[in-house]
């Protein structure tokens, strides 16, 4: 019996690991344009602020597609669905690597965004299903760790590959790694019938839960602020702080490394007081943005700000996702789809706001605007915390 239990634990952990790897590759490809923005703009003879709208387009496809695509795929067995998504993901990266103009690159990114829409709608609930008993919260933490490693390894390595070869090679390598992950998924995942996915009828039921709706609005607000600044952090560090490309790469690495600390803090502290944890994480996201320009030429201060910012955004993202799942246990996939859509409305809006700020005010002001949006989100958190104190 002991052998059976150990075998179960081993395979369950391996399955969680596969989902963590999947989160790694999906987050790497979503945000790697941030690390390659200047190179892509240069190759197509465009401005960074204009190319940055590619991030907006990607995010808005995800935000618009998450719920309807999840509902359309609600009855499909999950392993088969995941393998289909990875096939499209890989083909889209091949097109990215071959893109002969910006519009072809944009089209390929839309294909990737399509897979993203469904992947993040179903993954949180699936990783909890395959996790070992009594390890559900830790499994969600490992999923977040995969996302954090995308920032630690994915973005810096993507930038290094882009500098050594070119940005097209970065997308080619991502497609190759995704192929290996798909093979692991095919080998390790069990048959996963759709369960508690929810239906279209679940949507109006969830809409009647005011705290849940308040959390979705909070996600849009705080993530809009974050991406107003983060979408253009690479050109900010190079052009405003005037640090070298190597220092820029190292700062992106530090941002991702901080995500590991954020995942650890979530697993240890969230359950003790979820409301205070979310508020503290938001402060860590907001303050570094507001002070970014103030300390623009102090290298060690920028490193510290980026580290704290990375801790904040990672722990905040996991905490908000966990809160959504707690508030909608009867329709986890629908709730996750709306969460993913809300998050990507924030990403797209933030990248758009950042582009507008750059064109109208200048690159140096992105932190002030992003931080101000974050402060509005903090006030909103305070409001819903008081109004729904017993929920």
From Swiss-Prot:
Family statement drawn from the similarity comment of this UniProt entry: Belongs to the major facilitator superfamily. SotB (TC 2.A.1.2) family.
Q: Which Gene3D superfamilies match?
A: MFS general substrate transporter like domains (1.20.1250.20)
CDD domains of this UniProt entry?
A: MFS_NepI_like
Main localization of the protein described in the UniProt heading: membrane
Its recorded name reads Probable sugar efflux transporter
What keywords are assigned to this protein? Cell inner membrane, Cell membrane, Membrane, Sugar transport, Transmembrane, Transmembrane helix, Transport
- Pfam families assigned: MFS_1 (PF07690)
Name one cellular component (GO) term.
Answer: plasma membrane
* Topology in membrane: Multi-pass membrane protein
Q: Does the keyword Cell membrane apply?
A: yes
Species this protein is from: Helicobacter pylori (strain HPAG1)
What's the stated role of this polypeptide?
Involved in the efflux of sugars. The physiological role may be the reduction of the intracellular concentration of toxic sugars or sugar metabolites.
Its domain of life reads Bacteria
Molecular function terms in GO for this entry? carbohydrate transmembrane transporter activity
For this protein, the parts annotated as crossing the membrane are: 16-36, 51-71, 82-102, 110-130, 138-158, 170-190, 210-230, 247-267, 277-297, 300-320, 338-358, 361-381
Where does this polypeptide localize?
Answer: Cell inner membrane
């Amino acid at each position: 019996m002991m052998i059976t239990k150990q075998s179960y634990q081993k395979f369950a952990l391996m399955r969680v690991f596969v989902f963590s790897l999947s989160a790694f590759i999906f987050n790497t490809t979503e945000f790697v344009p941030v690390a390659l923005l200047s190179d892509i703009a240069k190759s197509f003879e465009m401005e960074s602020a204009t190319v940055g709208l590619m991030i907006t387009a990607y995010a808005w496809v995800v935000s618009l597609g998450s719920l309807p695509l999840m509902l359309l795929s609600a009855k499909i067995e999950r392993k088969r669905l995941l393998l289909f998504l990875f096939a499209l993901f890989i083909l889209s990266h091949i097109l990215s690597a071959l893109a002969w103009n910006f519009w072809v690159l944009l089209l390929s990114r839309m294909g990737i965004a399509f897979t993203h829409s469904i992947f993040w709608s179903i993954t949180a609930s699936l990783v909890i299903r395959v996790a070992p008993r009594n390890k559900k919260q830790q499994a969600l933490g490992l999923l977040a760790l995969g996302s954090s490693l995308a920032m630690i390894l994915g973005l810096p390595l993507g930038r290094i590959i882009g500098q050594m070869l070119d940005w097209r090679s970065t997308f080619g390598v991502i497609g190759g790694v995704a192929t290996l992950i798909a093979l692991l998924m095919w080998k390790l995942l069990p048959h996963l019938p759709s369960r508690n996915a929810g239906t279209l009828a679940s949507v109006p039921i969830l809409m009647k839960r005011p705290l849940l709706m308040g959390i979705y609005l909070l996600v849009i607000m705080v993530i809009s602020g974050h991406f107003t600044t983060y979408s253009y952090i690479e050109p900010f560090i190079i052009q405003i702080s005037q640090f070298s490309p190597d220092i820029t790469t190292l700062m992106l690495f530090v941002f991702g490394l901080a995500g590991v600390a954020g995942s650890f803090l979530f697993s240890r502290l969230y359950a003790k007081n979820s409301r205070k944890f979310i508020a503290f994480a938001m402060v860590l996201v907001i303050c570094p943005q507001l002070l970014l320009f103030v300390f623009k030429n102090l290298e060690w201060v920028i490193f510290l700000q980026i580290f704290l910012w990375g801790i904040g955004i990672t722990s905040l993202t996991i905490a908000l996702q966990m809160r959504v799942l707690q508030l909608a246990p009867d329709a986890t996939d629908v709730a996750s789809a709306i969460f993913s859509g809300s998050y990507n409305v924030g990403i797209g809006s933030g990248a758009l706001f950042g582009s507008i700020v750059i064109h109208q005010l200048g690159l140096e002001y992105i932190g002030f605007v992003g931080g101000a949006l974050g402060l509005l989100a903090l006030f909103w958190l305070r409001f819903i915390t008081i109004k729904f104190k017993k929920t």
